[in-house]
Amino acid sequence: MKLTRLLLFLAGCGLASAAQPNIVFILADDMGWNDPAFAGNCFIETPHLDRLAREGVVFSAACASAPNCAPTRACLLTGQYPPRHGVYTVVDDRHAPGSPHHRLLAAESREALPAESVTLAEALRPKGYATAIFGMWNLGRGRTGPSTPVGQGFDVFVEPKQLGFEKDAYRDARGAYSPDVLTDAALKWVDTVKDRPFFLYLPFHDVHAPFDPKPELLEKYRGRPGTPDPALAATVEAMDRNVGRVLATLERLGLKEKTYVVFTSDNGGTRQYVAPLRGGKGTLYQGGLRVPALIRGPGLRPGVSNATTLSMDWFPTLLELTGTPTPEVDGRSLVPLLRDPAATLRRDVFWHFPCYIGGGGPCSAIRSGDWKLIEFFEGGRTELYDLSADPGELRDLASAEPKRAAELLAKLRAWQTSTGAPRPVEPNPAYDPKAEPNRGRENRGKGPKNPK
């Protein structure tokens, strides 16, 4: 199956040429929708991201394809919804189906990206692209095999562990800062492939907690009145500096005008940082889904698009921009929005999270226009929101708009059926109420009372 799909790519691909654009895809970890200054943050300085925003297209309503890291990474690399590839969450003992603190038997999640998946890197290689990932893969373990980066189309894979960093650590034994070292390695690689088209995937660990910020930046924000969290602010600015280093290298090598630079995050931020949105990472409320997103590159009309976009849309978008044949995928190309940011993108979009993680339980959601419906599998209840009037999702209109709620639920169920999405409705026989952690009322589909 995979060989057949790759042969189809080869049949439609010509030889690489100097005119083929490069791609630099920078992915933040847990960066909330309003952490960068270009998204409205008044406390954190992100001059390099702000420059990208001025020179490119910003997607002001961008959402992750999933509320946590692994599935979103699978979606952006394959252009598919989670039920297609089966990656729903990070697989570890805390979230294993049948855990005593789960009311329902959660769906099984793949630990690795299916070997038959065709990734963005695999699609680009027949066009003569050099491909590399420097950072977190999170879609399978090991360095060789069909589900590793090398098995999924990347010529080079450098993870923090290879550079002397423990898992999720910002610093090594010498005190070196992981994002800086990864950026050093990535830019050295760019120097070696500068004379051919390349795809650089740079998934940073920042801004995932717990933070270990640079002292001078931490001191800067501690001395700035009103900064909500100096450690987060310092970590965001440190990441922005590395973005600046990438941009400076592209300019030094004369590659700015032939390179698309994408920046986004894998999911929404933690709930204390996403106000006025509700929820956070691990939930299907807007706080868990909204992410910063932008692209700069040749032929784009700078501006702001208000269309609802998903992580999986980057796959067909970047293939179209590089003239690469695109297989049938769930994502939609955003190229029309890059030519005219005021253009519309009409479609229903879906999310499916049949697992437990942190504060979030199994649920599924649909957005159709301004309306969003969430189905919570615990208790079998739904919530309905008009995001145009209530972006914070405080007023559940399911009872006031029963017809609309029923129509959206029918669409959601039809989509679940068409994609083979698992519906975790079976009670967990091992459930122990005393073992249940305090997950918060809103993540069980029991949100706060509507304001008077």
Q: Could you describe each region identified by the protein language model?
A:
Residues 41-46, 61-68, 107-118, 172-182, ...:
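A short beta-strand-to-alpha-helix junction
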Residues 21-32, 51-52, 76-78, 124, ...:
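Beta-strand elements within well-structured catalytic alpha/beta cores of enzymes
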Residues 268-284, 300-301, 307-387, 418-422, ...:
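C-terminal cap/loop subdomain of S1 sulfatases and analogous C-terminal strand-loop tails that border
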Residues 89-130, 137-200, 204-216, 222-225, ...:
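Formylglycine-dependent
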